[in-house]
């Protein structure tokens, strides 16, 4: 966040001066990392960029202004995050369709923590003295509808989310499992409602799932994806080799890094014919010489990357815009 509209002169500042421009309680993302993210996104050259952990609409506007040549329309609704990390989009200007964004941040997820359930069972007030019937999404599930003329007649819908992390500082839900499972089930409910309302419209589900939601070795909290929907991971549909799907690396001792896919785009059968062959991949960040960075095998290497998540890229082609 800046005091006023920033100028591109800010891009020439040293890091300490760059940080002083922020008027927020949160630091700016380091200038070099922000520039490297923009470099990667320009190389990918996507029409629609789906983003997690965005520091609000102002941050997204500034990123588009300073780093992306104002080529996109920033699109974000502030969610429920207590850490100021939202989900949002950058949508290329001049595309032959319109878009509409809706939030589900007020939707209940039909979940209380174990101690809250016990308190209500015995008639005690829950934390803070509030009578709580259910929590909401940790962040949000936003609905992006793409349409030609009538917003009620979209030709494609994208659901973007960032499910509950594995952090459990209050020690009330180990690894965030129950909350994440409840959020996933409510996400599926939203998906099914849209399927019913728009039966011939493909609905895509994307975001940071904070766990293994792939069809192989599926974490328990995500199994409903495969029993209740026909959604499939776009990398699975593209038949990308398993070792090429990692979007996050957990650095271990002894210079060992475990690659995991925790970021996903799930597409319905309606979209399978429109997935461009060989277009789906996980983008690897590059150095100043244009060479892909090695897998990070220690924390220094990991922290030097623009982000600890890698972009997932794919192309939908020849989809009727009706």
Where are the regions that the model predicts?
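Structured beta-strand-rich core segments of catalytic domains in phosphoester-bond hydrolases
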Residues: 48, 53-161
């Amino acid at each position: 966040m800046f005091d006023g509209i920033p100028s591109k002169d800010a891009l020439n500042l040293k890091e300490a001066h760059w940080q002083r421009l922020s008027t927020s309680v949160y630091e700016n993302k380091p200038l070099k990392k922000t520039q490297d993210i923009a470099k990667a996104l320009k190389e990918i050259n996507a029409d629609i960029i789906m983003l997690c952990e965005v520091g609000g609409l102002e941050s997204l506007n500034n990123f588009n202004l300073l780093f992306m040549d104002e080529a996109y329309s920033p699109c974000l609704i502030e969610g429920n995050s207590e850490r100021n990390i939202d989900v949002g989009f950058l949508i290329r200007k001049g595309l032959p369709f319109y878009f509409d964004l809706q939030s589900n941040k007020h939707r209940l997820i039909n979940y209380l923590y174990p101690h809250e359930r016990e308190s209500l069972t015995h008639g005690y007030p829950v934390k803070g003295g509030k009578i709580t019937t259910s929590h909401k999404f940790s962040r949000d599930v936003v609905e992006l509808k793409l349409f030609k003329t009538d917003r009620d007649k979209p030709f494609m819908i994208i659901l973007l989310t960032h499910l509950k992390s594995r952090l459990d500082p209050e020690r009330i839900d180990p690894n965030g499992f129950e909350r994440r499972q409840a959020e996933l089930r409510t996400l599926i409910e939203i998906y099914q409602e849209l399927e019913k309302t728009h039966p011939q419209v493909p609905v895509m589900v994307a975001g940071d799932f904070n766990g293994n939601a792939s069809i192989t070795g599926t974490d328990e909290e995500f199994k409903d994806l495969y029993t209740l929907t026909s959604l499939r991971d776009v990398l699975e549909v593209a038949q990308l080799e398993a070792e090429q799907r990692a979007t996050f690396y957990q650095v271990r001792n002894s210079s060992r890094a475990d690659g995991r896919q925790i970021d996903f785009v799930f597409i319905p059968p309606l979209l399978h014919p429109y997935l461009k062959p060989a277009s789906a991949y996980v983008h690897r960040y590059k150095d100043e010489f244009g060479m892909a960075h090695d897998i990070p095998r220690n924390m220094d290497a990991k922290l030097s990357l623009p982000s600890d998540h890698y972009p997932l890229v794919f192309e939908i082609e020849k989809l009727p815009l009706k």
